[in-house]
A protein has these predicted regions:
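Core AdoMet radical
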Residues: 77-92, 99-125, 131-152, 159-210, ...
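C-terminal extensions
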Residues: 306-336, 362-422
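Short, electropositive alpha-helical surface patch
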Residues: 122-130, 134, 159-168, 228-247, ...
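Alpha-helical ds-nucleic-acid-binding substructure associated with the helix-hairpin-helix region
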Residues: 271-274, 288-326
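Flexible, acidic/Gly-rich N-terminal and inter-domain linker regions that tether
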Residues: 1-66, 371, 379-380, 387-408, ...
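Cys/His/Pro-rich metal-binding microdomains
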Residues: 68, 72-75
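Conserved C-terminal portion of the radical SAM core fold
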Residues: 173, 188-265, 274-300
C-alpha cells in the first residue's frame, strides 16, 4: 500500500467517524468455492462476533469528503477548511481486498460526500460494490450509503451488490432541515427509500418464481437522525421512527447525538457535550417499539414529550401506570410480563415455559435472569418479601432506583445496555 493511499485513508476514515449507522447485522453470506470472504449476522453494531468467537470489523470509510452541500451540522460541509481527499474506485477496491487478506476486516461500510450531482456520486459507489462482487468475488458484508436524489436505476443496481442500503433523514422535521441545510429536502430521501422497498418486494416475488434470482439488499435498509441539533422533541423523533418501521424493509433507525463540530455557525446550539444520555434513551425507546410491543403514545405524549433522562423508558411507563401493577408472575400473560421493568424477552419466555412445571419464586426468577432490583416492585410471586409500587408509591420506587449522583458527573460515560434484561 503506497503512502498516497495511506494519507487518503487517514483523512477519509476521520471524516467517516461521525456516522453511527454502521452495522454488520441482518445478513449471512457463507464462503463458497471461488469467492473471497464471508459474514455472520450480528445485531446492530460495527463490531460483531462470529459463531466461533471472532470479532468482525468493517472498513468504515468515505469515497470522498469533498461535498457540494454546505450543511451546518456536517464536518465535511463545503465551506469548511479541512483536509480533503478522494479515493478512486480501484484504490478503494484494492484497499478493501488488502485489508481483508490481512484479516483486518470482514466487510465494508461506504459513504461519500456528494460531488457534481447525486447520480455521479452514486454511480461511483455502485462501481466499488460491483467490482468487489464480480471482479474480486468478495463475499463479505457491504453497506452502502445511498445518495439522496439518486436515480431508481442506480439504487436498484446498488441493491444487487450491497447487503444493506441506507438513506439518512438527518433532521427529523423538514422545516428544520431547510434551516440548517437549505439545499436538501426530505423528498430526495424518501424517494430512494421507496425504490429500495419496491426492489425488495419485487425481488421477493421473483425468487418465488425463479430459483436463481440474486437477492436484493438482503439486510434491508436503515436510516439515521441527528438528535439535539434542532428543536424536535423525543415524541417527534419516535413518531417518525414508528412510521418508518411500518415499512417492511426498514430494519433500523439510528440516533446520533449532535456533536458540535462547527461552533462558528450561529444556527446551531452551543453544546459542550453531545446529548449522549438522550441518545441512549431514544435507543431504549426504539427497542420497546420494535421488540416489546409498545406504542409511541405509551412512551411519550403531550404531557411527557421528552424521555426521562434519569430512568429508562420502560421503568418510566411502569411508574406512570401503577394501577396495572403488581402482576402475578405465575398467572400473567406474556405481553404483560414483557412490560415489567427488569424482564427482557428471553426472561419472559423462560418464565412462561418454567411456570408450567412449578410456581416461580424470587430465587427462580433471579436464576432465569430477571433483574430483581427493578422487577421486585412490580410483581408478586412465592417468597417475594418486597413491598410493591403501590405500597411504596411511584415516587418512592423512583427514589430507590435512580442512581445517586456522584460528586463529579462525567456525562461522557454511558453504558448502552441493550441486553435482554431491559
Amino acid at each position: 500500500m503506497n503512502e498516497n493511499v495511506l494519507a487518503k485513508l487517514k483523512v477519509l476514515a476521520e471524516s467517516a467517524k461521525y456516522d453511527v449507522s454502521c452495522s454488520s447485522s441482518g445478513t449471512v453470506r457463507r464462503n463458497q468455492s471461488g469467492t473471497l470472504g464471508n459474514t455472520v449476522g450480528g445485531w446492530g453494531i460495527c463490531h460483531s462476533f462470529a459463531e466461533d468467537g471472532r470479532c468482525i470489523s468493517l472498513l468504515k470509510i468515505m469515497l470522498t469528503n469533498y461535498c457540494i452541500y454546505d450543511c451546518a451540522y456536517c464536518i465535511n460541509r463545503r465551506s469548511n477548511d479541512i483536509p480533503r481527499a478522494t479515493l478512486s474506485v480501484s484504490e478503494l477496491v484494492d484497499l478493501t481486498i488488502e485489508f481483508y487478506r490481512r484479516n483486518y476486516i470482514e466487510g465494508l461500510f461506504l459513504s461519500s460526500g456528494v460531488v457534481r450531482n447525486p447520480d455521479y456520486t452514486m454511480e461511483r459507489l455502485v462501481r466499488v460494490a460491483k467490482d468487489l462482487r464480480l471482479v474480486h468475488k468478495f463475499n463479505g458484508y457491504i453497506h452502502l450509503k445511498s445518495i439522496p436524489g439518486a436515480s431508481r436505476e442506480l439504487v436498484n443496481e446498488a441493491g444487487l451488490y450491497a447487503d444493506r442500503l441506507s438513506v439518512d433523514i438527518e433532521i427529523p422535521k423538514e422545516e428544520n432541515l431547510k434551516l440548517l441545510a437549505p439545499e436538501k429536502d426530505h423528498k430526495s430521501v424518501y424517494q430512494p427509500m421507496r425504490y429500495i422497498q419496491q426492489g425488495v418486494l419485487t425481488n421477493k416475488e421473483d425468487r418465488k418464481k425463479f430459483r436463481h434470482v440474486p437477492r436484493f439488499v438482503p439486510a434491508g435498509q436503515s436510516t439515521q437522525m441527528i438528535v439535539g441539533a434542532t428543536t424536535e422533541s423525543d415524541k417527534d423523533i419516535l413518531y417518525l421512527s414508528s412510521s418508518l418501521y411500518q415499512h417492511p424493509t426498514m430494519r433500523r433507525v439510528y440516533y446520533s447525538g449532535y456533536i458540535s463540530v462547527n461552533t462558528y455557525d450561529k444556527r446551531l446550539p452551543a453544546l459542550k457535550q453531545p446529548p449522549l444520555v438522550r441518545e441512549n434513551r431514544l435507543y431504549q425507546a426504539d427497542w420497546l417499539l420494535r421488540f416489546y410491543q409498545f406504542k409511541v403514545e405509551e412512551i411519550v405524549d403531550d404531557s411527557y414529550p421528552d424521555l426521562d433522562l434519569e430512568i429508562d423508558p420502560k421503568l418510566g411507563w411502569a411508574l406512570r401506570h401503577p394501577e396495572l401493577f403488581p402482576i402475578d408472575i405465575n398467572q400473567a400473560d406474556y405481553e404483560m410480563i414483557l412490560r415489567v421493568p427488569g424482564i427482557g424477552i428471553k426472561s419472559a419466555r423462560q418464565i412462561i415455559a418454567s411456570r408450567r412445571f412449578s410456581k416461580l419464586g424470587f430465587y427462580e426468577l433471579k436464576k432465569i435472569g430477571v433483574v430483581m432490583k427493578k422487577a421486585q416492585y412490580f410483581i408478586t410471586c412465592n417468597e417475594l418479601p418486597t413491598r410493591t409500587v403501590n405500597e411504596l408509591t411511584p415516587t418512592g420506587v423512583r427514589r430507590l432506583l435512580v442512581p445517586k449522583p456522584k460528586k463529579k458527573v462525567d456525562e461522557r460515560q454511558l453504558i448502552l445496555n441493550f441486553t435482554d434484561n431491559e
